[in-house]
UniProtKB/Swiss-Prot annotation:
Signal peptide (UniProt feature, chain positions): none
UniProt source species: Clostridioides difficile (strain 630) (Peptoclostridium difficile)
UniProt: ATP binding residues: T29, L30, G31, P32, D86, G87, T88, T89, T90, G413, D478, A479, L480, D494
Function field: Together with its co-chaperonin GroES, plays an essential role in assisting protein folding. The GroEL-GroES system forms a nano-cage that allows encapsulation of the non-native substrate proteins and provides a physical environment optimized to promote and accelerate protein folding.
Subunit structure: Forms a cylinder of 14 subunits composed of two heptameric rings stacked back-to-back. Interacts with the co-chaperonin GroES.
Keywords assigned: ATP-binding, Chaperone, Cytoplasm, Isomerase, Nucleotide-binding
UniProt protein name: Chaperonin GroEL
Length: 542
């Protein structure tokens, strides 16, 4: 296929146009007075959201070169979402600012490679300074503040803080849709492990790519299943009962897998197979944990059990199981409470006895899964459109809270970025030439999140930024109440991990963007011309 090639300034301008189209769409959502964006959907009602990464993922531009620019910034939002789960709009705003300031310098003749070096040096200093300012999150109130700021809703903040209190920081919190108009918290004992379905054909919800089994039987074995004959006796009993089945095995492959998939697609029975978590002896222990939680018996030749002889009494039960590509969550297993308590006590004893940090960490993980359980935040709303919007906000708040517990918090509302500017100023004094220009680009870009929050609140961004720069440490602008306050004391905080990831990812993509000198894109295919037109009418008769 023929290609179209653009060079130097023409390339950069086309790419920047794409960056701006995406970033300008996303950045209207930043801050407490940020607006929402409505996204058209092929099926169902449109989605209204303020989630940066959800908006970015929807944007595809017609111009191929502009689209390349947009996709680069989309990568910033996606990567930040993957690492921290929140801060995607902030990351997009920072990337746009670094690209804008950087292109001014490149156009003026600066060397982009040296600019990139300066950007990287400044980001390293900024990240270090953010970590120095970070405060550990310990109280339920601090957790509530982080969640409230992210979701823009105090009630949600309290719910998430309560959920963290119930399951502990190592527990599992999921977000589901409620059948009522209220948003409430439901804590259920459960377990999550990092193994997903062995075949994508087993999903029950194609949009979310997940399989949900309500009230299933659970078969647990430490052997590889490749022959369907081994499973037939127990499968026949399950089909007669009309129940669903979760298989946890070393692997399910070959004839066994294809037969299960075909029968699932035909609707004969509902089955999901997942690989057993862990390796070696740890796998045996984890399978035993799951068995105790669900009231099952691990079918293992070591214990004298054969898969062919398995019956329903050896299978576990749970109220529901959710399996995604990467994880399996078992909720409300029907195991004996006393047996679960004994197992928890046994693991605690092992934690005390072990001298290996790695073993201790793995034992604590198992303990959290057995004792911590699963908290479910059930999101309610009057309409489906509002429900989806609220659900996205709560998922963001949950991610922000986890990030805060992990790495601590800094002053929110863009204040933390402004507060690291003096440290970059010190760095700039030690640099020279175009490397110095690169550091200055970051220094200016760090003002952008605060400026955008002020603009979205209908205020003059430059004035607000200047006032905060000249204020004491941790003093920032409360855009909701339009006043200057100590952000930490006012509970306006951001997770350090979110701020750090946003800056690192924005700088990574933006600095690489500046080094671009040529772009290659497919030429649009030309439509085949139709048959040439025939002359109308009959030839004249003599």
């Amino acid at each position: 296929m023929a290609k179209e090639i653009k060079f130097s300034e023409e390339t950069r301008r086309a790419l920047e146009a794409g960056v701006n189209k995406l970033a300008d769409t996303v950045k209207v959502t930043l801050g407490p007075k940020g607006r929402n964006v409505i996204l058209d959907k092929k099926f169902g009602s449109p989605l209204i959201t303020n989630d940066g990464v959800t908006i970015a993922k929807e944007i595809e531009l017609e111009d191929r070169f502009e689209n390349m620019g947009a996709q680069l910034v989309k990568e910033v939002a996606t990567k930040t979402n993957d690492v921290a789960g929140d801060g995607t709009t902030t990351a997009t705003v920072l990337a746009q600012a670094i690209i804008r300031e950087g292109l001014k310098n490149v156009t003026a003749g600066a060397n982009p490679i040296l600019l990139r070096k300066g950007i990287q040096k400044a980001v390293t200093v900024a990240v270090e300074e953010l970590k120095n300012q970070s405060r550990i999150v310990e109280t339920q109130e601090a957790i509530s503040q982080v969640a409230s700021i992210s979701a823009g809703d105090e009630e949600v903040g309290k719910l998430i803080a309560e959920a963290m209190e119930i399951v502990g920081k190592d527990g599992v919190i999921t977000v589901e849709e409620s059948q009522t108009m209220n948003t409430e918290l439901d804590a259920v004992e459960g377990m999550q492990f990092d193994r997903g379905f062995v075949s994508a054909y087993m999903v029950t919800d194609v949009d979310k790519m997940e399989a949900v089994l309500n009230d299933p039987y659970i078969l647990i074995t430490d052997k590889k299943i490749s022959n369907i004959q081994e499973l037939l006796p127990v499968l026949e009993q399950i089909v007669q009962q009309g129940k669903k089945l979760l298989i946890i095995a070393e692997d399910v492959e070959g004839e066994a897998l294809s037969t299960l998939v075909v029968n699932k697609l035909r609707g004969t029975f509902d089955v999901v197979a997942v690989k057993a978590p862990g390796f070696g002896d740890r796998r045996k222990e984890m399978l035993q944990d799951i068995a105790i939680l669900t009231g099952a018996q691990v079918i293992s030749e070591e214990l004298g059990y054969d898969l062919k002889e398995a019956d329903l009494s050896m299978l576990g039960r749970a109220s529901s199981v959710k399996v995604t590509k990467e994880s399996t969550t078992i909720v409300d297993g029907s195991g004996d409470k006393k047996a679960i308590e004994d197992r928890v006590t046994q693991i605690k004893h092992q934690v005390e006895q072990t001298t290996s940090d790695f073993d201790r960490e793995k034992l604590m993980e198992r303990l959290a899964k057995l004792a911590g359980g699963v908290a479910v935040v059930k999101v309610g709303a009057a309409t489906e459109v509002e429900l989806k919007e609220r659900k996205l906000r709560i998922e963001d708040a949950l991610n922000a809270t986890r990030a805060a517990v992990e790495e601590g918090i800094v002053a929110g509302g863009g204040t933390a970025f402004v507060s690291v500017i003096p440290a970059i100023g010190t760095l700039i004094e030690s640099l020279e030439g175009e490397v110095k220009l690169g550091a200055q680009i970051v220094k200016k870009a760090l003002e952008e999140p605060l400026r955008q929050i002020a603009i979205n609140a209908g205020l003059e961004g430059a004035v607000i930024v200047q006032n905060v720069v000249n204020s004491e440490a941790e003093t920032g602008f409360d855009a909701l109440n339009e006043k200057y306050v100590n952000m930490i004391e006012a509970g306006i905080v951001d997770p350090t991990k979110v701020s750090r990831s946003a800056l690192q990812n924005a700088a990574s993509i933006a600095s690489t963007f500046l080094t671009t000198e040529a772009a290659v894109a497919d030429l649009p295919e030309k439509e085949d011309a139709g048959m040439p037109g025939m002359g109308g009418g009959m030839p004249g008769m003599m």
